[in-house]
């Protein structure tokens, strides 16, 4: 899938700190929304 690791992403549904349009899911930035 389209994901990016993120050390600051913890809670699901939070915007990613440096990937606009991505959401945080399991400490990763996921495009669109959490599955």
Swiss-Prot record:
Domain of life: Eukaryota
Keyword terms of this UniProt record: Cleavage on pair of basic residues, Disulfide bond, Ion channel impairing toxin, Knottin, Neurotoxin, Secreted, Toxin
Positions annotated as propeptide: 1-8
UniProt GO cellular component terms: extracellular region
Presence of the UniProt keyword Secreted in the record: yes
Annotated tissue distribution: Expressed by the venom duct.
Entry's Gene Ontology molecular function annotations: ion channel regulator activity; toxin activity
Disulfide bridges in this chain: 9-25, 16-29, 24-34
Role this protein plays: Probable neurotoxin with unknown target. Possibly targets ion channels.
Recorded family membership: Belongs to the conotoxin O1 superfamily.
Domain comment as written in the entry: The presence of a 'disulfide through disulfide knot' structurally defines this protein as a knottin.
Subcellular compartments: Secreted
Protein name in the entry: Conotoxin Cal6.1g
């Amino acid at each position: 899938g389209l994901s990016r690791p993120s050390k600051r992403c913890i809670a699901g549904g939070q915007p990613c700190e440096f990937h606009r349009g991505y959401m945080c899911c399991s400490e990763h930035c996921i495009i669109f929304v959490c599955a």
